[in-house]
Amino acid sequence: MNLRVATSSDVPALRALIDLSARTLSADFYSPAQIEAAVKHVFGVDTQLIADGTYFLVETTDGPVAAGGWSARRTLYGGDQMKADADPLLDPLAEPARIRAFFVHPDWARHGLARRLYSACVDGALTAGFRRFELMATSPGEPFYASLGFTVEERVTVSLPGGVEVPFARMSRAIDSPN
């Protein structure tokens, strides 16, 4: 398995991975209506991460089986479909970097791929001068992030079109400690 920086040519395969991961791994945590609303309105590829070179994937000969990244930009979560404005850069001395858009193929869940992605994020964020991470965790993702030392700062409910509400958890941790 190869870990590499995602490129714009990976976007179609990443969209398919995100849809499959979200629909399958969220089934025990969210209702079908919540999953479909989140897939349509929240989950997706953030092409700014790809342009910045901070979105990674793990691939086999069959294509991407895991993806995730970090960001030095203000957006905390969501794909391109959530963005309406410019996405300004953060100040690494005063603001936390973002962990963004971790998705794993259901057949590869709990095989250490997300941890490999997280390690790449730590290296990149530390090199850029950041000392803290912040993220918005899905309910299925929260236990994974907690295992990395993230703590819940706030419980958030996101209201989506159609009156669907989806719970998330804003989490953070220092990144200058071992991961």
Q: Model-found features: residue ranges?
A:
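A glycine-centered beta-loop-beta connector
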Residues: 59-65
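Conserved GNAT-fold acetyl-CoA-binding loop/helix
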Residues: 19-45
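Conserved GNAT acetyl-CoA-binding A-motif
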Residues: 118, 125-138
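A short beta-loop-alpha structural element at the N-terminal edge
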Residues: 2-16
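Conserved acyl-donor/pantetheine-binding loop and adjacent beta-alpha core of acyl/acetyltransferases
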Residues: 52, 65-109, 119, 124, ...
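Conserved G/P- and acidic residue-centered "switch" motifs that form tight phosphate/ATP-binding loops
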Residues: 10, 112-114
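Hydrophobic beta-strand residues of extracellular immunoglobulin-like
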Residues: 54-57
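Conserved catalytic-core motifs of GNAT/GCN5-like acyltransferases
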Residues: 39, 75-78, 134-136, 146, ...
